[in-house]
């Protein structure tokens, strides 16, 4: 298989001058895949793949009805075995293409670094240079750095269709491709590397890309941990080093004049994997405990490996080197306290002080692992000998002791290498790896509180209370010095309470930082937050200490998801911040109010315009409120991978937030396929972290200087656009008869639910086919599969057209908004990507799946009309003659995939017809289930996203 090259514009041709190497590698990998298909699947399958590939390439060049009929007739003749092999061929081609593009992008960045000139927009060097030009001094930069918190949060939402086995093979192909590209190889070594790539492609072909069984929560936890082992443990120190080097270069004169700087540890990670129980009955207190223990074992294993490696580096011998007095005293103490470390060989490293110290540290970490092994073997920690590290602070003290000794004795350059990297790791990951968030739906807490109150005779009908009475009752309970003992609750409610008790215990046994936020989904009112605090109070997470002072070891993060909930943010948060006891608890937990904003459900609810604008306004309201009350604020952005779920480049997304609302802190979800694309390789992970952090720096200018506010007129225009766009979207999705039938019949939403790509059900309620029941992930995933991508653009065309009505003055204002307002620019940029990924010709074919052909055609025409209107209006406003003109490389990447996606979409349509055909027996229908599910994975790989 070789790569398709579409007809190119002049701009694209210039862009492709630097794209030659990419095309060569795509062609090379495609050729190897073709060889493997021929060898493993046989000539017939190879010829079939080639016929389809070339046929659909020709169809893209010339929309020939006779050729399309011929190709579709040919598809209908293929048996299920051949279809399965054909689908796999295209799916693996997409995986290889994605890997080649990732390697190519990394290679280009390395060329820029080696050339020593200007780097890519969003690099540390580019960002700091612009900040300095804008007047940010090194002192101000230090102030900004001291306020930063950058926290990606990994989730296990069922959108990652790629198996970990395949990711490991693709990682090896990435590294081999790097050897061919960057390293000068002898002809022999080059041939050997090419053979090794072919071997990996053979393994790829021989490894099933579709999971045979649905993953358990434990599987999902391990999948999340995979990215730390494969990339993040190396990428995090690298990104800190990159920032330090850029600061030294940009602020060289200040540093040479004697001004110093420190880059504090501001990168933190969070996770929902094993903690998110909203709608997932398989996440229990036991699985949450297992997640924490797996996290701890993963990170301590890494520390053990790195300490072992350091012992082969810090080999200084006495009397050839000097050590600090503190180091000498520590070694003497360790000889007594940890004598067992040297029991087998007392004189080990006797004259090598750093190696002897590191060996003691290695012994202590080994004891930590032994304790954990007891948990995984017997369900309880092994007996503690007293040698294990109690917490990360003890390990950091030992590492800093070595660091300071090296620096004091002239070895700062040695201290600043591998040892410094390990210190960064411990500062970042502690003994807990990442902060595990707990998420639960609000009604579960209300039910539990109601039973607690009834069982303790505090109140017998909590559900009948008004919101104000609930707040008063709950505040009263929180203010009591003592609460009554609890009886055993009913099953589900006892499980809710067990989670709070588990948090109390593991904060004590593992780390006070083991848990992040307690996220309440579907937060509608202030009592929902107070309910969680009362449950936390019952479990000992907050309350009064022996001195009578308030303490709180729980941070509650209300999640506002729907358009209506976003509009209620101000009264809900005001009620909380005006509650004196809540404020005292908030102060005790760090005086930080975190608020989570749901992109996915708000977009599904009211469309992309209503979602984006209501989220923008919500952030302004939260920022204003918390500032008035003297409370720090952090927004937690619940973004998905696709545009319809808040996706898009992280750097641009951060910059598009309302001016002055970021304030140095940002937390956001990284979901599904985003994880493998961003963190599957060290090199890309370091780049993605850097791009996000540089965006955070730029957006945090308000910490040290006034920032330009949005023109009030722009806000008013956006309000009008949103009103029209939301009305258009709701008219289609809620008021148009037959729309949901169209969705379920045209999109593979039911079939997606059959895929083994996540432990959580695809619907909130089984059998409920309403728009509110289908999860936002399934909603977006399904529209993407059928090439509608509807949630990411519907209503924008109508909104733009109805506002400007071809008035040139109004058009000029919209164009000025694109140039001056990052939010509006990012909105239309993301819309262009969604429009590019849509294909109305193919979507029309999916529309033919409707049982009522006339109704299906009518519905499609409504959607297609808005698509073309949106296409025309967006291009008009951004002043371009085609989509994504500002990002030609990305545009070409998407176009390069089109003729390979086309046959998979047509195969999927054919298989949906066969699988849903109730006129044949179940056995006949089941024949097509496996190849059908494979088309879903293949299209996901080709479009580079799922939900």
Give the residues covered by each predicted segment.
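Often metal-dependent polyanion-binding catalytic scaffolds in large enzymes
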Residues: 1-474, 492, 647, 733-736, ...
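Hydrophobic cores of alpha-helical transmembrane segments in multi-pass integral membrane proteins
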Residues: 34, 619-629, 864, 868-874, ...
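Carbohydrate-active enzymes and regulators
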Residues: 36, 51, 65, 100-102, ...
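Structured alpha-helical segments in the cores of large, soluble enzyme domains
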Residues: 130, 163-175, 189-208, 388, ...
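Beta-sheet entry/capping signal
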Residues: 264-266, 270-272, 280, 423-424, ...
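Catalytic or ion-translocation cores adjacent to nucleophile or general acid/base/metal-coordination motifs
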Residues: 283-315, 539-727
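Active-site cores of enzymes that catalyze phosphoryl transfer or operate on phosphate-rich substrates
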Residues: 363, 367, 371, 434-436, ...
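Long, compositionally biased intrinsically disordered regions
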Residues: 699, 706-947
């Amino acid at each position: 298989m070789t790569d398709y090259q579409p007809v190119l514009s002049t701009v694209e041709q210039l862009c492709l001058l630097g794209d030659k190497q990419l095309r060569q590698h795509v062609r090379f990998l495609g050729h190897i895949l073709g060889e493997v298909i021929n060898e493993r699947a046989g000539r017939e399958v190879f010829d079939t793949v080639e016929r389809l590939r070339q046929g659909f390439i020709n169809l893209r060049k010339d929309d020939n009805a006779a050729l399309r009929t011929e190709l579709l007739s040919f598809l209908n003749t293929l048996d299920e075995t051949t279809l399965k092999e054909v689908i796999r061929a295209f799916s693996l081609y997409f995986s290889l293409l994605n890997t080649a593009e990732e390697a190519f992008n990394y290679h280009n960045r390395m060329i820029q670094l080696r050339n020593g000139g200007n780097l890519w927009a969003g690099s540390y060097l580019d960002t700091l240079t612009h900040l300095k030009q804008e007047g940010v001094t090194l002192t101000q930069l230090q102030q900004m750095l001291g306020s930063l918190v950058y926290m990606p949060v990994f989730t296990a939402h069922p959108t990652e269709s790629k198996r970990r086995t395949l990711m490991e093979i693709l990682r090896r192909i990435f590294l081999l491709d790097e050897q061919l590209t960057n390293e000068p190889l002898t002809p022999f070594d080059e041939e050997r590397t090419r053979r090794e790539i072919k071997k990996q492609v053979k393994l790829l072909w021989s490894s099933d890309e579709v999971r045979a069984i649905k993953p358990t929560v434990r599987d999902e936890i391990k999948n999340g941990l995979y990215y730390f082992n494969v990339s993040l443990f190396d990428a995090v120190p690298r990104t800190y080093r990159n920032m330090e080097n850029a600061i030294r270069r940009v602020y060289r004169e200040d540093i040479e004049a004697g001004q110093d700087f420190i880059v504090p540890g501001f990168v933190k990670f969070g996770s929902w994997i094993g903690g998110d129980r909203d709608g997932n009955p398989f996440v229990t207190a036991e699985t949450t405990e297992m997640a924490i223990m797996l996290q701890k074992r993963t990170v301590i294993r890494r520390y053990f490996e790195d300490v072992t490696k350091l012992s082969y580096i810090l080999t200084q011998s006495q009397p050839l080197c000097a050590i600090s007095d503190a180091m000498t005293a520590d070694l003497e103490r360790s000889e007594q306290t940890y004598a067992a470390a040297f029991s087998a060989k007392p004189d080990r490293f006797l004259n090598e002080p750093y190696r002897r110290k590191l060996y003691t540290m290695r012994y202590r970490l080994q004891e930590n692992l032994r304790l954990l092994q007891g948990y995984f073997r017997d369900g309880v920690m092994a007996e503690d000998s007293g040698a294990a590290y109690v917490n990360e602070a003890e390990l950091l003290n030992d590492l800093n002791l070595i660091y300071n000794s090296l620096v004091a004795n002239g070895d700062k350059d040695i201290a600043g290498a591998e040892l410094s990297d390990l210190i960064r790791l411990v500062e970042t990951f502690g003994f807990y790896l990442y902060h595990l968030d707990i998420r639960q739906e609000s009604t579960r807490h209300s039910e539990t509180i109601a039973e607690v109150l009834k069982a303790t005779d505090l109140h017998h009908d909590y559900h009948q209370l008004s919101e104000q009475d609930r707040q008063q009752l709950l505040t009263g309970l929180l203010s009591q010095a003592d609460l009554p003992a609890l009886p055993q609750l009913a099953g589900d409610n006892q499980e809710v309470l067990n989670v709070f008790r588990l948090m109390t215990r593991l904060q004590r046994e593992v780390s006070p930082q083991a848990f992040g936020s307690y996220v309440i989904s579907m937060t509608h009112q202030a009592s929902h937050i107070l309910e969680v605090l009362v449950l936390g109070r019952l479990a000992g997470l907050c309350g009064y200490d022996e001195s009578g002072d308030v303490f709180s070891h729980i941070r509650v993060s209300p999640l506002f998801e729907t358009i209506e909930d976003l509009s209620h943010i101000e009264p809900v948060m005001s009620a909380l911040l005006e509650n004196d006891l809540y404020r005292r608890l908030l102060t005790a937990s760090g005086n930080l109010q975190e608020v989570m904003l749901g992109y996915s459900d708000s977009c599904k609810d009211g469309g992309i315009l209503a979602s984006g604008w209501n989220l923008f306004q919500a952030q302004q309201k939260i920022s204003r409120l918390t500032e008035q009350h003297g409370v720090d604020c952090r927004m937690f952005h619940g973004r998905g991978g696709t545009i319809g779920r808040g996706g898009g480049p992280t750097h641009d997304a951060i910059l598009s937030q309302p001016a002055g609302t970021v304030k140095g802190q940002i937390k956001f979800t990284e979901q599904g396929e985003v994880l493998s694309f961003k963190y599957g390789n060290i090199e890309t992970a370091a780049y993605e972290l850097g791009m996000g952090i540089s965006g955070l720096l730029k957006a945090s200018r308000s910490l040290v200087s006034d920032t330009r506010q949005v023109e009030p007129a722009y806000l008013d225009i956006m309000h009008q656009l949103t009103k029209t766009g939301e009305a258009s979207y709701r008219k289609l999705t809620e008021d148009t008869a037959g729309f949901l039938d169209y969705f379920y019949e045209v999109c593979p939403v039911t079939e997606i639910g059959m895929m083994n790509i996540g432990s959580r059900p695809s619907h909130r309620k089984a059998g409920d086919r309403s728009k509110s029941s289908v999860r936002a992930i399934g909603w977006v995933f399904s529209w993407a599969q059928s090439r509608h991508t509807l949630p990411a653009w519907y209503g924008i065309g109508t909104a733009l057209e109805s506002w400007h009505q071809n008035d040139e003055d109004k058009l000029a204002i919209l164009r000025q908004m694109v140039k001056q307002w990052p939010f509006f620019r990012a909105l239309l940029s993301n819309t262009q990507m969604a429009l590019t990924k849509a294909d109305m010709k193919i979507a029309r074919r999916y529309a033919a799946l409707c049982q009522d052909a006339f109704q299906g055609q009518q519905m499609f025409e409504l959607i297609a009309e808005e698509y073309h209107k949106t296409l025309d209006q967006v291009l008009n406003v951004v002043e371009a003659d085609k989509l994504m003109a500002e990002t030609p490389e990305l545009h070409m990447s998407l176009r390069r995939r089109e003729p390979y996606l086309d046959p998979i979409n047509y195969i999927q349509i054919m298989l949906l017809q066969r699988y849903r055909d109730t006129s044949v027996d179940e056995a006949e229908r089941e024949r097509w289930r496996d190849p059908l599910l494979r088309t879903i994975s293949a299209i996901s790989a080709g479009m580079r996203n799922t939900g």
